[in-house]
């Protein structure tokens, strides 16, 4: 196998970040740097003990990329930050893997699309709930019904509350 893929992770202390770290490890890629606004010294030491740089901002991660050429930045930050962070990565030709939603409005999604169209990089999003037990069961129930049965479309709402300490202060 050739060179390992190099990743940066933005929002390293967030709820979903450990799953991204696990996925990066599962494909034998290198997590080169992580960033979060709220690192304490113990958290920094833990990452540093694994030869993972700890950074305080996306801007620092961009500088890291300029010297170490990251293949991807994985964005695990609060939703309202995604659009500007994605665009910054695209402007620096860094591929982005971003938690859903990519954007909070159609106009923001259009901004992302426009930025991607002039960038050498691409944006990828995550829809991990397709493997959630409840979703799998729903799909099985839908596909097991006879084809001549009428189907009713109903709105489904899934709420996952994050711990208070994961929100910016």
Language-model region placement:
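N-terminal Rossmann-like dinucleotide-binding module
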Residues: 1-50
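Short strand-turn motif at the edge of the Rossmann-like AdoMet-binding core
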Residues: 100-101, 127-129
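Rossmann-fold dehydrogenase core element
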Residues: 111-128, 151
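Oxidoreductase and adenylate-handling cofactor-binding alpha/beta cores
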Residues: 131-154
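Conserved small/polar residues in nucleotide/adenosyl-binding loops
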Residues: 159-166
């Amino acid at each position: 196998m050739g060179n390992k893929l190099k990743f940066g992770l933005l929002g390293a202390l967030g709820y979903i970040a450990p799953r991204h770290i696990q996925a990066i490890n599962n494909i034998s890629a290198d997590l080169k740097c992580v960033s979060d606004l709220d690192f304490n010294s113990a958290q920094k030491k833990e990452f540093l003990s694994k030869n993972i740089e700890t950074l305080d901002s996306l801007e620092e991660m961009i500088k890291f990329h300029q010297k170490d050429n990251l293949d991807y930045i994985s964005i695990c930050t609060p939703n309202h930050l995604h659009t500007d962070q994605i665009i910054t990565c695209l402007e620096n030709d860094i591929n982005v893997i971003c938690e859903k939603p990519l954007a909070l409005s159609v106009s923001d999604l259009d901004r992302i699309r426009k930025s991607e169209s002039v960038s050498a990089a691409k944006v990828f999003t995550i829809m991990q709930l397709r493997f959630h037990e409840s979703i799998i069961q729903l799909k099985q129930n839908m596909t097991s019904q006879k084809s001549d049965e009428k189907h009713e479309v109903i709105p489904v709402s899934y709420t996952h509350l994050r711990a208070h300490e994961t929100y910016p202060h």
